[in-house]
């Protein structure tokens, strides 16, 4: 039996994650003989703490060991299992990412535009197709396609005080910005 694919692992591990109201955000497999590694990155509307991650690591390890013992999967001579959250540098690619990061700062870059603009994440539309962006000091007029001023003109947050709606699309590259103070709940 070959080393399992990320798809196979996701199929096997999703019930464990969903039992804790978590989503598997990413599975990373690094094959290197005795030093192979399987990384499982989980997140949820309620962020998992270290105790929950430890419990899930135990459950996932037991499930993978049982599958290997049954001959359904093979991890080779040995592997290291890492169960964690994806971290702040994970791009926001699904509506749930935007919902979970409401009130945080986000750097947004649309394909074809050179620089990213920093906005604060507002409410996600009920149909999860758009998100409200609240201007910050680093915000421009608004991302293209947001219903904001056309022509690429820039304005400071002093000039541009109204939130804009950004349609969620694959052309949007967005990453949460690290903020050392508590974000406001506007």
Question: What is each stretch, according to the model?
Answer:
Residues 1-186:
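Short Lys/Arg-rich amphipathic alpha-helical segments
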């Amino acid at each position: 039996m070959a080393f399992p694919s990320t798809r196979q692992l996701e199929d096997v591990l999703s019930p464990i994650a969903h039992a804790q109201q978590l989503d598997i955000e990413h599975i990373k497999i690094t094959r290197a003989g005795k030093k192979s590694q399987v990384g499982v990155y989980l997140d949820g509307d309620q962020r998992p703490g270290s105790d929950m991650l430890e419990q899930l690591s135990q459950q996932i390890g037991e499930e993978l060991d049982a599958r290997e013992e049954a001959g359904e999967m093979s991890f080779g001579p040995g592997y290291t299992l890492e169960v964690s959250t994806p971290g702040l540098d994970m791009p926001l690619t699904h509506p749930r990412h935007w919902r979970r990061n409401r009130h945080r700062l986000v750097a947004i870059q649309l394909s074809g535009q050179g620089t990213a603009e920093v906005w604060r994440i507002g409410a996600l539309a009920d149909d999860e197709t758009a998100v409200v962006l609240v201007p910050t000091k680093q915000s421009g007029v608004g991302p293209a396609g947001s219903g904001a001023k056309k022509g690429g003109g820039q304005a400071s947050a002093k000039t541009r005080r109204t939130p804009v709606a950004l349609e969620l699309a694959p052309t949007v590259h967005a990453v949460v910005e690290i903020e050392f103070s508590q974000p406001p709940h506007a």
